[in-house]
Amino acid sequence: TLSVSAVGYKSQERKVVLKRGKTLEENFELEEDMVALDGVVVTANRSETARRLAPTLVKVVTPKLFEQTNSHTLSQGLVFQPGVRVETDCQNCGYSQVRINGLDGKYTQILIDSRPIFSSLAGVYGLEQIPANMIERVEVVRGGGSALFGSSAIAGTVNIITKEPVRNSGSFSHTISNFDSSGSFDNNTALNLSLVSSDNKMGAYVYGQNRHRSAWDSNGDGFSELPKLKNQTIGLNAYYRTSAYSKLSLEYHHMEEFRVVEVVSACRPI
Protein backbone atom coordinates (compact mmCIF):
# COMPACT_ATOMS: atom_id res chain seq x y z
CA THR A 1 0.00 0.00 0.00
CA LEU A 2 1.36 3.38 -1.06
CA SER A 3 0.30 6.39 1.02
CA VAL A 4 0.83 10.04 0.03
CA SER A 5 0.21 13.03 2.30
CA ALA A 6 1.06 16.72 2.31
CA VAL A 7 0.30 19.67 4.55
CA GLY A 8 -2.98 21.27 3.49
CA TYR A 9 -4.14 18.32 1.37
CA LYS A 10 -6.15 15.17 1.99
CA SER A 11 -4.15 11.94 2.21
CA GLN A 12 -4.55 9.20 -0.39
CA GLU A 13 -3.76 5.48 -0.28
CA ARG A 14 -3.40 3.15 -3.23
CA LYS A 15 -2.56 -0.55 -3.46
CA VAL A 16 0.23 -1.36 -5.89
CA VAL A 17 1.76 -4.61 -7.13
CA LEU A 18 5.47 -4.67 -7.90
CA LYS A 19 6.86 -6.96 -10.59
CA ARG A 20 10.49 -7.87 -11.04
CA GLY A 21 12.21 -6.09 -13.93
CA LYS A 22 9.40 -3.58 -14.46
CA THR A 23 9.19 0.07 -13.51
CA LEU A 24 5.94 1.21 -11.97
CA GLU A 25 4.86 4.85 -12.12
CA GLU A 26 1.96 6.15 -10.04
CA ASN A 27 0.60 9.68 -10.28
CA PHE A 28 -1.40 11.25 -7.47
CA GLU A 29 -3.60 14.33 -7.60
CA LEU A 30 -4.24 15.44 -4.03
CA GLU A 31 -7.39 17.29 -3.08
CA GLU A 32 -6.90 20.47 -1.10
CA ASP A 33 -8.26 20.30 2.44
CA MET A 34 -9.81 23.67 3.28
CA VAL A 35 -11.47 22.52 6.50
CA ALA A 36 -8.42 21.83 8.67
CA LEU A 37 -4.72 21.90 7.96
CA ASP A 38 -2.57 19.25 9.61
CA GLY A 39 0.11 21.45 11.16
CA VAL A 40 3.78 20.55 11.32
CA VAL A 41 5.83 21.12 14.47
CA VAL A 42 9.53 20.68 15.21
CA THR A 43 9.77 21.08 18.99
CA ALA A 44 8.45 17.66 20.01
CA ASN A 45 11.43 15.63 18.74
CA ARG A 46 13.69 18.18 16.94
CA SER A 47 12.43 17.15 13.50
CA GLU A 48 9.46 18.12 11.35
CA THR A 49 6.51 16.04 12.49
CA ALA A 50 2.78 16.24 11.90
CA ARG A 51 1.26 17.80 15.00
CA ARG A 52 -1.19 14.93 15.55
CA LEU A 53 1.68 12.41 15.40
CA ALA A 54 4.01 14.28 17.77
CA PRO A 55 4.99 12.29 20.90
CA THR A 56 4.21 15.27 23.17
CA LEU A 57 1.47 17.89 23.16
CA VAL A 58 2.66 21.00 21.32
CA LYS A 59 0.70 24.25 21.54
CA VAL A 60 1.19 26.61 18.59
CA VAL A 61 0.88 30.41 18.67
CA THR A 62 0.36 31.84 15.18
CA PRO A 63 0.94 35.40 13.87
CA LYS A 64 -2.84 35.74 13.62
CA LEU A 65 -3.04 35.74 17.43
CA PHE A 66 -0.45 38.52 17.67
CA GLU A 67 -2.45 40.60 15.18
CA GLN A 68 -5.83 40.03 16.83
CA THR A 69 -4.51 40.91 20.30
CA ASN A 70 -2.31 43.80 19.09
CA SER A 71 0.73 42.12 20.65
CA HIS A 72 4.08 43.64 19.70
CA THR A 73 6.38 41.31 21.64
CA LEU A 74 6.61 37.65 22.58
CA SER A 75 5.60 38.29 26.20
CA GLN A 76 2.36 39.99 25.14
CA GLY A 77 1.39 37.10 22.86
CA LEU A 78 2.15 34.33 25.34
CA VAL A 79 -0.39 35.79 27.78
CA PHE A 80 -3.15 34.25 25.64
CA GLN A 81 -1.58 30.77 25.55
CA PRO A 82 -3.36 28.13 27.71
CA GLY A 83 -1.20 26.58 30.42
CA VAL A 84 1.36 29.39 30.29
CA ARG A 85 1.50 32.23 32.81
CA VAL A 86 3.34 35.45 32.01
CA GLU A 87 3.87 37.64 35.07
CA THR A 88 5.68 40.90 35.73
CA ASP A 89 8.08 40.76 38.67
CA CYS A 90 10.62 43.03 40.38
CA GLN A 91 9.39 46.49 41.41
CA ASN A 92 12.70 47.94 40.26
CA CYS A 93 13.09 46.71 36.67
CA GLY A 94 9.66 45.18 35.97
CA TYR A 95 10.93 42.19 34.01
CA SER A 96 8.55 39.54 32.63
CA GLN A 97 8.94 35.81 33.06
CA VAL A 98 7.10 32.74 31.79
CA ARG A 99 5.82 30.27 34.37
CA ILE A 100 5.10 26.74 33.16
CA ASN A 101 3.98 24.05 35.61
CA GLY A 102 4.39 26.58 38.44
CA LEU A 103 8.17 26.92 38.06
CA ASP A 104 10.12 30.16 37.67
CA GLY A 105 11.10 31.52 34.29
CA LYS A 106 14.71 30.36 34.60
CA TYR A 107 13.46 26.77 34.31
CA THR A 108 11.89 27.39 30.89
CA GLN A 109 14.16 27.09 27.86
CA ILE A 110 13.72 29.80 25.20
CA LEU A 111 14.76 28.62 21.74
CA ILE A 112 15.16 30.50 18.47
CA ASP A 113 14.74 28.15 15.51
CA SER A 114 15.29 25.16 17.84
CA ARG A 115 18.62 26.52 19.10
CA PRO A 116 19.19 27.47 22.77
CA ILE A 117 20.56 30.95 22.13
CA PHE A 118 19.04 32.48 25.30
CA SER A 119 20.51 31.69 28.70
CA SER A 120 18.26 31.32 31.73
CA LEU A 121 18.90 34.99 32.66
CA ALA A 122 18.36 36.30 29.13
CA GLY A 123 15.20 34.20 28.91
CA VAL A 124 13.75 36.31 31.73
CA TYR A 125 14.63 39.74 30.36
CA GLY A 126 14.43 38.76 26.69
CA LEU A 127 10.68 38.19 26.43
CA GLU A 128 10.08 41.87 25.68
CA GLN A 129 13.05 42.03 23.30
CA ILE A 130 11.63 39.56 20.78
CA PRO A 131 9.33 41.44 18.38
CA ALA A 132 6.22 39.82 16.96
CA ASN A 133 7.14 40.79 13.39
CA MET A 134 10.02 38.27 13.36
CA ILE A 135 7.88 35.34 14.52
CA GLU A 136 6.40 32.81 12.10
CA ARG A 137 4.97 30.78 14.98
CA VAL A 138 5.71 29.86 18.59
CA GLU A 139 5.67 26.25 19.75
CA VAL A 140 5.14 25.65 23.46
CA VAL A 141 5.85 22.29 25.10
CA ARG A 142 5.01 21.79 28.77
CA GLY A 143 7.16 19.36 30.72
CA GLY A 144 10.82 18.46 30.93
CA GLY A 145 12.93 18.31 27.80
CA SER A 146 16.51 18.67 29.03
CA ALA A 147 17.74 15.75 26.94
CA LEU A 148 16.63 17.52 23.74
CA PHE A 149 17.00 21.22 24.45
CA GLY A 150 19.43 21.74 27.33
CA SER A 151 19.52 21.92 31.10
CA SER A 152 17.08 24.85 31.38
CA ALA A 153 14.19 22.92 29.80
CA ILE A 154 12.81 21.66 33.12
CA ALA A 155 9.38 23.30 33.25
CA GLY A 156 8.92 23.51 29.50
CA THR A 157 10.20 24.82 26.20
CA VAL A 158 9.23 27.86 24.13
CA ASN A 159 10.51 27.52 20.55
CA ILE A 160 10.37 30.66 18.39
CA ILE A 161 10.30 29.86 14.67
CA THR A 162 11.40 32.94 12.75
CA LYS A 163 10.00 34.07 9.43
CA GLU A 164 11.70 33.13 6.17
CA PRO A 165 11.51 35.11 2.91
CA VAL A 166 8.77 33.78 0.63
CA ARG A 167 8.16 36.62 -1.82
CA ASN A 168 9.19 40.23 -2.34
CA SER A 169 7.27 42.31 0.16
CA GLY A 170 7.64 44.94 2.84
CA SER A 171 5.68 46.57 5.64
CA PHE A 172 5.96 49.46 8.08
CA SER A 173 3.84 50.17 11.14
CA HIS A 174 3.75 52.52 14.11
CA THR A 175 1.52 52.05 17.15
CA ILE A 176 0.89 54.42 20.07
CA SER A 177 -0.76 53.20 23.28
CA ASN A 178 -1.77 55.28 26.30
CA PHE A 179 -2.14 54.15 29.92
CA ASP A 180 -5.42 55.41 31.43
CA SER A 181 -5.00 58.94 30.00
CA SER A 182 -2.06 59.54 32.34
CA GLY A 183 0.29 60.94 29.73
CA SER A 184 2.41 57.78 29.67
CA PHE A 185 2.72 56.37 26.17
CA ASP A 186 4.05 53.20 24.59
CA ASN A 187 5.43 53.88 21.10
CA ASN A 188 6.28 50.93 18.88
CA THR A 189 7.71 51.12 15.34
CA ALA A 190 8.17 47.94 13.26
CA LEU A 191 9.70 47.34 9.83
CA ASN A 192 9.75 44.18 7.69
CA LEU A 193 11.42 43.56 4.33
CA SER A 194 11.44 40.29 2.36
CA LEU A 195 13.56 39.79 -0.78
CA VAL A 196 13.66 36.65 -2.95
CA SER A 197 15.61 36.08 -6.18
CA SER A 198 13.76 35.27 -9.40
CA ASP A 199 14.98 31.66 -9.34
CA ASN A 200 14.15 31.24 -5.62
CA LYS A 201 17.72 30.19 -4.86
CA MET A 202 18.47 33.14 -2.58
CA GLY A 203 16.36 35.11 -0.17
CA ALA A 204 16.63 37.43 2.82
CA TYR A 205 14.20 38.61 5.48
CA VAL A 206 15.09 41.75 7.42
CA TYR A 207 13.13 42.94 10.44
CA GLY A 208 13.50 45.76 12.92
CA GLN A 209 11.65 47.23 15.87
CA ASN A 210 12.11 50.33 17.99
CA ARG A 211 10.08 50.69 21.18
CA HIS A 212 9.91 53.50 23.71
CA ARG A 213 7.64 53.23 26.75
CA SER A 214 7.25 55.97 29.31
CA ALA A 215 7.24 55.17 33.00
CA TRP A 216 3.72 54.67 34.42
CA ASP A 217 2.64 55.33 38.00
CA SER A 218 -0.79 53.74 38.54
CA ASN A 219 -1.45 54.70 42.18
CA GLY A 220 0.25 58.08 42.43
CA ASP A 221 2.82 57.12 45.07
CA GLY A 222 5.62 58.69 43.07
CA PHE A 223 7.23 55.44 41.91
CA SER A 224 6.46 53.87 38.54
CA GLU A 225 4.76 50.46 38.39
CA LEU A 226 5.92 50.05 34.79
CA PRO A 227 9.53 51.17 34.25
CA LYS A 228 10.76 53.38 31.45
CA LEU A 229 11.74 51.14 28.55
CA LYS A 230 13.85 51.68 25.45
CA ASN A 231 14.22 48.70 23.14
CA GLN A 232 15.87 48.29 19.74
CA THR A 233 15.89 45.02 17.82
CA ILE A 234 17.16 44.23 14.34
CA GLY A 235 17.75 40.93 12.58
CA LEU A 236 18.35 39.09 9.35
CA ASN A 237 17.33 35.64 8.11
CA ALA A 238 18.87 34.66 4.76
CA TYR A 239 19.36 31.46 2.78
CA TYR A 240 21.07 30.10 -0.33
CA ARG A 241 19.80 26.86 -1.87
CA THR A 242 22.69 24.65 -2.97
CA SER A 243 20.34 21.95 -4.29
CA ALA A 244 16.71 20.90 -4.22
CA TYR A 245 17.21 19.23 -0.81
CA SER A 246 19.78 21.41 0.97
CA LYS A 247 20.47 25.06 1.70
CA LEU A 248 22.82 27.32 3.60
CA SER A 249 21.23 29.57 6.21
CA LEU A 250 22.47 32.77 7.84
CA GLU A 251 20.86 34.42 10.87
CA TYR A 252 21.74 37.61 12.70
CA HIS A 253 19.93 38.98 15.75
CA HIS A 254 20.82 42.15 17.65
CA MET A 255 18.81 43.15 20.71
CA GLU A 256 19.45 46.11 22.98
CA GLU A 257 17.37 47.26 25.93
CA PHE A 258 17.43 49.90 28.64
CA ARG A 259 14.91 49.98 31.49
CA VAL A 260 14.78 51.95 34.71
CA VAL A 261 12.25 52.85 37.40
CA GLU A 262 11.55 56.57 37.57
CA VAL A 263 10.25 58.85 40.29
CA VAL A 264 7.22 60.14 38.42
CA SER A 265 6.04 62.76 40.90
CA ALA A 266 6.48 63.82 44.49
CA CYS A 267 5.09 61.39 47.03
CA ARG A 268 1.73 62.24 48.50
CA PRO A 269 1.72 63.28 52.19
CA ILE A 270 0.72 60.61 54.69
Where does each model-flagged region fall?
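Short, acidic, small-residue-rich periplasmic hinge/interaction motif at the N-terminus
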Residues: S3-K10, K19-E67, G105
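Short, polar/charged loop or turn motifs at beta-strand boundaries
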Residues: T56-L74, Q97-L103, D113, N178-D180
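Extracytoplasmic beta-strand/coil segments of soluble accessory domains associated
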Residues: S75-S119, E136
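Non-catalytic regulatory/gating segments with a bias toward low-complexity or hydrophobic composition
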Residues: L78, V138-E139, V158-I160
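Membrane-embedded beta-strand positions in outer-membrane beta-barrel channels/transporters
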Residues: Q97, R137, T157, A190-N192, ...
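Short acidic/polar hinge/loop motifs at secondary-structure boundaries
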Residues: Q97-R99, R115-R142, K163
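Residues that define the transmembrane beta-barrel architecture of outer-membrane proteins
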Residues: S152-I154, F185-T189, K228-Q232
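Periplasmic-side early beta-strands and strand-to-turn transitions of outer-membrane beta-barrels
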Residues: R167-S177, S181, N192-P269
